Amino acid sequence: MILVILIIIILASKIIYFGIKSQPQKSDSIIILGCKVKGNDPTPFLRRRLDEGLRLYNEGYGKYIIVSGAKGPGENISEAEAMQKYLVQKGVDKKFIILEDKSRNTLENIKFSKKKMEDNNLSSSIIVSNKYHLKRAELLCQKEGIKASYSGVFVRSHMSHEIMGFLREIPALLVYYIKTM
């Protein structure tokens, strides 16, 4: 029992620390990881990720934005399409947005976005997601050979969702470590 508690504390600490210390570095691209879409529109979590990606883009951190996410249950369009629509409405030229609309989970987000990077001769990226999600994203980027930095968001107005996401991330990180042993 003590070992289980210790493992949970260690994993939780890794997630929190990485989310807090992550700093974006200028890169060729910005990858925004998908999240639930309501109908055709991004949910508050996804909007916050998009706003962070947009901020980085406008500040010159990356020339291209890769939006990553398939169409999930109850969604009218793919997460990538909803993200592209949102960014275009915010003034981003469509030619600087690369759609990756096949991924259904974080591993596929990273793998399929890497392929889009290769197809477009991009060598580095900033990964944008919620802070609790970044540690696992970092491990997956390392595994896939993506040169990346990270920028995380925290949606205070949806604290219960942030807490649930953080709690889900602990076993997800544990599963990742077990699978890669």
What residue ranges belong to the model's regions?
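Short, Lys/Arg-enriched, disordered terminal segments
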Residues: M1, Q89, N121, T180-M181
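Hydrophobic membrane-insertion alpha-helices, especially the h-region
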Residues: M1-L11
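A structural signal for short, hydrophobic/glycine-enriched beta-strand patches
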Residues: L11-F166
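A transmembrane-helix-recognition feature enriched in membrane-embedded lipid enzymes
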Residues: E162-M181
